[in-house]
């Protein structure tokens, strides 16, 4: 028998990187310094380190190899790698020992989806997990017992989703779920739950497989998602000692907890929380029960144990509150992109001390049916078939649909509902498969959605071995052809992510489209890869949400958008991408923009409402309870960049710039004017142009921003009843300045001017003007929305009523060429280099002006003969410049009077042309390739021509400046 168990064991296990985490370039943020200590490091703040202490800490991230049987073992005996056998030895044997001694034993598994719970508890293939090993060892020990003992093993398996219980060993689904009853002797029990007697491990294995199939069917048809439901497997183990008239009864509870939803990260905060709160309710109440029981064990006075507060705690009352020995396995991901979820899991495990795992069982009746079905299925192994795929690896390839000779309907995981939904609900009328003449074809019916290898089909299509099929929104299957076509292919590579990547590629979504060129080497950066992973993860969810909107006639259409945060950055850098969901109402044309987290939360609420609709509840839904409804809001349509470099030289800038939306397409054209002025508002002329921005240092600087009009607003073309507003914020201004709203105009005339003043222009402010752009946002107004406030209350103003900027010291802006040398394109660096090349010209001009003053003084004193003779040479910043002879001085003085004015004009022309070049560069960087492959070659030619034009414009601007200065 195993060594004696302890009453409570808490453990944590770290898995290897998943393929998705590898693709995202994830880094490991978890370390283990001993078998009991786990340390996490915040990826955003490496100095922020948290340490957690557990009874056991298993390092399974790396340092392993495969033995001859394919089992993972430590590559080096001195290393700390923990395999499946190590976990069972520490936890599984303790569970068995408790059962033999008559104690209730509970094993709890907790962790975010994909953290490795299923691998630790059930395992795959030869890498057997805790549950099957416990069952196998239990029957092995029974076989070695004496003849004076009788043993009885009973299995039951249920699922708890939103406080509703479902028996996974029953093919029939009871409306409203099973009920919990209470008996004075038995305590809480589930009325009508099937408990199946088992005589050997093979029966348990078949029951687990059967239960998993039933659960797979449920998740395939969008009922309780496996990651958001609790799974409870109970093994009732009874020992009867005939010679001693003694009976021992123990209950082994194997519980797989749903993942806990952190409201803030999931977007539930301030939104509807019912679905998420139902999931969290069981976890919270379980933690409360455990905490109270722990207080009681320490001798504290306990008035009430809240078993009745949730379904889960009612069922586990006898296991938690009696002679139970409980073990917890917290499964976590080591990736930095999962840091928040990992930290949440570790905190829960350390605080509550207990959590659970999953298992499976089946009924005696179902087992007989399975045997009969197996005898019928054996000869069918020669037919081609479909294998199901699921996001949960444990539910993948557990359903097999054989395609026999002739024509048969598409796989229907549950009884067909009437009327069948053309995409969401898969019925036998969705599509048909025909097996004839040694080939298999699939034919979609009516408007039903069918995709083969990611490409939608509308007519009869021949299937090839290992083709990928998607029926409806997200029912995925792998086609396995005739046995003659089988080879040594590795089917494991065709996982759920493979299907979604293929689907995304077929729909034109790729890392390149999302902006992969932001890495200087042409490779997608981590932010792009992370956004792409979010994009493909949300694609099937958006498709399902659209279908759920159709049948109840909600009239919504949802589509994915990718927001480039560079559109909100005044330097125009390619920053992090963000995936959003644009929601449009067909009838009213109202538009909403939902974040990823908000959409996911709403989608689960939509699923609940849709299930009620399927159950026959077609009554009206209050707005506050309708996840398809939201208050009308203002929508951000696009942004424009207006570079402020000319303002640093006191030059007026008037131009038309494009508002670009999140797709990089033109949303409207903005006509604006930015001009330096006097405190009284009089615009400066050419004579006020400065050669060097440093001349403005410490001086008062006033300027006006005049928003003239917008042209061709697409938002207004879609619905003439809409309106627009424009907002911008400059430098350290705490609030955004908004123009007055304009309704029902495609070309809104705005004509609003705001004057700003920097009382003592700082070096930081001047650097900002030289290197940054003014971000102007275009906002769309809808009927019933709240307009953006135009009030300027709270802003600091001068005595003349002008808004103050540059009011506080900030950190000196780093040189752009150093701060973003690895982020900005080569052409942008060339523009910066061009600015640096003008510095020697400015130095020469400054020195000539100083010498001009000396020459004027000399000429004034020439008549008296007292003038000092000027030097024939002048040193300028390490260079030697030859000065004019005495005979040329008089002529030079007459020409010098207009030189400053000519230089100012030349610089004005130069910076205006460079501003055009900078705008063209920004549009070039936002230029996206077409989705159609046939247009790729014209796109490459067009982009090459744009680069050539930009280079010519840069060279022309520089040549004009140099020639003007030399004349």
From Swiss-Prot:
Domain FHA: 410-472
Binding site for ATP: 111-118
Keyword hit for GTP-binding: no
Matches recorded under Pfam families: FHA (PF00498), KIF1B (PF12423), Kinesin (PF00225)
Keyword Ribonucleoprotein: no
Cellular component, GO, one term: cytoplasm
Gene3D superfamilies linked: 2.60.200.20, Kinesin motor domain
InterPro entries found in the cross-reference section: FHA_dom, Kinesin-like_KIF1-typ, Kinesin_motor_dom, Kinesin_motor_dom_sf, P-loop_NTPase, SMAD_FHA_dom_sf
Top-rank taxon, per record: Eukaryota
Subcellular location, record wording: Mitochondrion membrane
Coiled-coil region: 822-851
Topology versus the membrane: Peripheral membrane protein
Annotated GO biological process: mitochondrion organization; organelle transport along microtubule; vesicle transport along microtubule
Stored SUPFAM superfamilies: P-loop containing nucleoside triphosphate hydrolases, SMAD/FHA domain
Protein keywords: ATP-binding, Coiled coil, Membrane, Mitochondrion, Motor protein, Nucleotide-binding, Transport
Residue span(s) of domain Kinesin motor: 7-355
Broad class of where this protein is predominantly found: mitochondrion
A GO MF term: microtubule binding
Purpose of the protein: Microtubule-dependent motor protein required for mitochondrion morphology and transport of mitochondria in neuronal cells.
PANTHER family: STAR-RELATED LIPID TRANSFER PROTEIN 9
Stated family: Belongs to the TRAFAC class myosin-kinesin ATPase superfamily. Kinesin family.
Protein name per UniProt: Kinesin-like protein KIF28P
Organism taxonomic ancestry: Eukaryota, Metazoa, Chordata, Craniata, Vertebrata
């Amino acid at each position: 028998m195993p060594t004696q168990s302890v009453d409570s064991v808490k453990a944590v296990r770290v898995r290897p990187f998943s393929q998705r985490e590898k693709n995202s370039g994830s880094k490991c943020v978890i370390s283990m310094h001993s078998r009991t200590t786990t340390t996490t490091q915040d990826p955003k703040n490496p100095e922020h380190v948290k340490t957690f202490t557990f009874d056991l800490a298993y390092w399974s991230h790396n340092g392993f190899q495969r033995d001859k049987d394919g089992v993972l073992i430590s590559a080096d005996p001195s290393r700390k790698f923990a395999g499946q056998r190590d976990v069972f030895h520490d936890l599984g044997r303790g569970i068995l020992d408790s059962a033999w001694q008559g104690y209730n034993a509970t094993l709890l598994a907790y962790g975010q989806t994909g953290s490795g719970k299923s691998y630790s508890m059930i395992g795959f293939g030869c890498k057997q997990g805790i549950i099957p090993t416990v069952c196998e060892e239990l029957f092995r020990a029974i076989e070695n017992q004496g003849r004076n003992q009788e043993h009885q093993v009973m299995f039951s398996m249920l699922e708890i989703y939103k406080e509703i219980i479902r028996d996974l060993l029953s093919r029939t689904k009871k409306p409203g779920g099973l009920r919990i009853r209470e008996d004075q002797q038995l305590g809480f029990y589930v009325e009508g739950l099937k408990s199946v007697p088992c005589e050997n491990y093979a029966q348990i294995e078949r029951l687990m497989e059967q239960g998993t199939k039933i659960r797979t069917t449920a998740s395939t048809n969008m009922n309780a998602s496996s990651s958001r439901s609790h799974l409870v497997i109970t093994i009732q183990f009874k020992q009867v000692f005939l010679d001693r008239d003694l009976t021992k009864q123990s209950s082994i509870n194997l519980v797989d907890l749903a993942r806990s939803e952190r409201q803030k990260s999931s977007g539930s905060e301030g939104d509807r929380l019912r679905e998420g709160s139902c999931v969290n309710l069981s976890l919270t109440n379980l933690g409360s029960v455990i905490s109270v029981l722990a207080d009681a064990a320490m001798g504290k006075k306990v008035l009430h144990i809240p078993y009745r507060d949730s379904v889960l705690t009612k069922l586990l009352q006898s296991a938690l509150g009696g002679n139970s020995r409980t073990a917890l396995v917290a499964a976590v991901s080591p990736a930095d992109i999962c840091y928040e979820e990992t930290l949440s899991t570790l905190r829960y495990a350390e605080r509550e001390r207990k959590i659970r795992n999953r298992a499976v069982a089946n009924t005696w009746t179902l087992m007989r049916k399975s045997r009969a079905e197996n005898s019928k299925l054996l000869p069918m192994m020669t037919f081609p078939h479909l294998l199901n795929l699921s996001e949960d690896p444990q539910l993948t390839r557990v359903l097999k649909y054989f395609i026999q000779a002739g024509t048969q309907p598409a796989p229907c995981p549950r009884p067909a509902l009437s009327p069948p939904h053309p995409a969401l609900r898969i019925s036998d009328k969705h599509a048909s498969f025909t097996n004839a003449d040694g080939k298999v074809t699939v034919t979609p019916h009516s408007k039903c959605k069918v995709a083969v290898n990611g490409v939608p089909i509308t007519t009869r299509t021949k299937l090839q071995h290992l083709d990928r099929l998607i029926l409806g929104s997200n029912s995925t299957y792998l086609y396995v052809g005739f046995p003659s076509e089988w080879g040594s292919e590795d089917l494991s590579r065709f996982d759920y992510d493979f299907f979604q990547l293929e689907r995304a590629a077929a729909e034109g979504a790729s890392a390149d489209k999302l902006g992969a060129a932001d890495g200087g080497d042409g490779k997608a950066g981590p932010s792009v890869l992370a956004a792409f992973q979010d994009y493909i993860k949300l694609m099937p969810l958006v498709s399902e949400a659209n279908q759920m909107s159709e049948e109840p006639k909600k009239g919504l259409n949802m589509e994915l958008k990718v927001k480039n945060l560079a559109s909100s950055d005044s330097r125009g850098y390619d920053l992090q991408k963000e995936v959003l969901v644009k929601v449009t109402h067909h009838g009213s044309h109202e538009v909403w923009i939902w974040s990823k987290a908000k959409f996911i939360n709403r989608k689960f609420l939509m699923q609940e409402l849709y299930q009620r609709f399927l159950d026959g509840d077609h009554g009206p839904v209050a707005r506050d309870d309708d996840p398809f409804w939201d208050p009308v809001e203002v929508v951000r349509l696009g942004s424009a960049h207006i570079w402020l470099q000319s303002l640093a030289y006191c030059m007026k800038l008037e131009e038309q710039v494009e508002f670009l939306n999140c797709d990089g397409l033109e949303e409207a054209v903005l006509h604006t004017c930015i001009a330096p002025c006097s405190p009284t508002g009089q615009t400066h002329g050419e004579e006020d142009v400065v050669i060097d921005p440093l001349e403005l240092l410490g001086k008062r600087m006033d300027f006006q921003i005049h928003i003239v009009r917008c042209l061709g607003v697409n938002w207004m073309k879609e619905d003439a009843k809409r309106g627009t507003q424009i907002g911008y914020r400059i430098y350290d201004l705490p609030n955004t300045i908004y123009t007055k709203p304009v309704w029902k105009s495609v070309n809104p005339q705005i004509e609003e001017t705001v004057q700003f003043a920097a009382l003592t222009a700082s070096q930081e402010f001047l650097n900002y003007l030289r290197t940054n752009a003014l971000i102007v946002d275009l906002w769309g107004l809808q009927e019933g929305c709240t307009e953006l406030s135009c009030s300027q209350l709270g802003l600091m103003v001068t005595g003349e009523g002008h808004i103050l900027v540059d009011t506080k010291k900030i950190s000196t802006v780093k040189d752009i060429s150093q701060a973003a040398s690895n982020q900005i394109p080569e052409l942008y660096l060339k523009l910066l280099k061009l600015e640096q090349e003008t510095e020697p010209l400015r130095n020469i001009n400054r020195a000539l002006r100083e010498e001009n003053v000396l020459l004027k003084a000399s000429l004034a004193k020439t008549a008296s003969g007292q003038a000092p003779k000027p030097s024939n040479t002048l040193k300028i910043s390490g260079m030697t410049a030859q000065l004019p002879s005495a005979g040329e001085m008089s002529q030079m003085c007459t020409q010098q009077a207009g030189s400053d004015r000519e230089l100012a004009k030349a610089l004005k022309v130069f910076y205006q042309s460079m501003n055009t070049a900078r705008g063209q560069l920004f549009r070039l960087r936002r230029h996206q390739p077409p989705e159609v492959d046939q247009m790729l070659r014209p796109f490459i030619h067009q982009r090459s021509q744009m680069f050539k034009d930009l280079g010519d414009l840069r060279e022309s601007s520089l040549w004009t400046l140099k020639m003007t200065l030399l004349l």
